[in-house]
């Protein structure tokens, strides 16, 4: 069963993928910045391999984004 947090995480990954493409950043460029293989980025963006929070933050950094927390 997928939790609401997993669904949110998957949605964030998809939005980040769209942003990366808008910025014309390739998966290879992201992979180089993260010191992983291009295939790892492909799997992450297609949600066949959900990254740890640390890897997701590295991904965000490599495409020029960051997480901002706010009180709810």
State where each predicted segment sits.
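A detector for short, charged/polar N-terminal pre-domain segments
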Residues: 1-11
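Short intrinsically disordered terminal tails
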Residues: 1, 71-72
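Short alpha-helical DNA-recognition segment
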Residues: 24-42
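Short alpha-helical segments used as structural interaction elements across diverse proteins
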Residues: 12-17, 40, 52
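DNA major-groove recognition helix of helix-turn-helix/homeodomain DNA-binding modules
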Residues: 52-70
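Short basic helix-loop element that most often maps to the first helix and adjoining turn
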Residues: 14-29, 58
